[in-house]
Amino acid sequence: MAAEAVRAFMLSWLLVHNYSPHQADAMVRQADIESGLQPCIRSRSGSWLFAWTGSRRVALARYADTPGCPGLETQLAFADHELRSEPAYAGFWGASSDRAFPVLRRCFGRGRC
């Protein structure tokens, strides 16, 4: 899937799942930095859309019930699950439109705040 198609799918999915436009944009920007919007890319810095590593990557594999690359929708659902269930990411939900991306980058991008 081409990067523009991934971007469009992500924006649509995130908006349908109650992300504000600035939160959805922040998620797309983060995925672009992590993977170039390539959902199945693997590198030394991480795997798949959000370059998951370590225990987060293992948790995603369990969530998706696959050791290989999960589908894009599954990766988005897992990211959503992480963001909504981990108290460390609460700042993202309360961030102003100009702070949503920096907060997401600092916390979610590193897997912790």
Regions found by a protein language model. Name each.
Residues 1-31:
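Export/targeting segments at the very N-terminus of extracytoplasmic proteins
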Residues 34-39, 87:
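Short alpha-helix boundary/capping elements
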Residues 15, 21, 38-42, 64:
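Hydrophobic alpha-helical bundle architecture
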Residues 26-35, 44-47:
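Acidic helix-start/capping segments at beta-turn-to-alpha-helix junctions
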Residues 42-113:
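Catalytic and binding regions of secreted/periplasmic enzymes and modules that target cell-wall glycans
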